[in-house]
Amino acid sequence: EGMKVIIDFVPNHVARAYKSDAKPAGVKDLGEDDDTSVSFKASNNFYYLPGQQFQPPANYSALGPNAAPTKDKKYSENPAKVTGNDQFTATPGINEWFETIKLNYGVDIQDNRKTHFDPVPSTWVKMKDILVYWANKNVDGFRCDMAEMVPVEFWHWAIPQVKAVNPEIIFIAEIYNPSQYRNYLETGRFDFLYDKVQLYDTLRLLINNQSSTAHIPGIQKSLDGINHNMLHFLENHDEQRIASPQFSGDYWKAAPAMVISAMIDKGPVMIYFGQEVGEPGAGKEGFNGEDGRTTIFDYWG
């Protein structure tokens, strides 16, 4: 009782093998009506590389040595689609987001990021409809993955429509560019932003005796007027566990930093599951191996 639900919304990219098997009746898949003969078209949902066959990174083996019924080492995609991190190549490297494909919000990336927002792009409508669908299911908020890789104009347009369904619903932006913080709050209409690049990064160094508290007042000063919009944390699925050998090896070392994170201003604070008991993120878990994290690529209990 009293528990609320915030779900992850990934607006920038989908899986390369994306196909919805649970969409409502009458709803078309992303890309279903795309003109794949051109690299960019404002009404397309994806970006394409006409005439080029997608090739996975050399020596990449899906699932490693593990066997699976779907593991036949074959994957056909022609024309190739652009990766989630904007790589216009049919042969992305292993460190690119090769297993994802970029969603097209009407931005012609190859033409100096020229925008085509009138008429409203198809991707805007489809992604807004997904948000509204879940708002109607009474979720309490969305953590928006890589929100800054999606045009702020989309958020300005979409968020009020979702809040018309539920005015109390909250939007949290994963964002790593401090110069865009105010833009995504004021124009984009987000409620909260990740406070990773400044406060988290500084506190991590402090926990390991690699920095000074002297940097913190300057960070807070740079956030004048928006401090209460910054979501503070010491752990999330992307970052290493405090108790992991790759971080501090002892979660009690982070106690002073947790006090700062929770009490430095009126911004919300996030505690990642297992943080309260010193989860060390130990053990190999698939793609990323022994990395001090829990579920960055692989989900386990």
What are these regions (language model features)?
Residues 256:
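Conserved interdomain hinge at the start of the Helicase C-terminal
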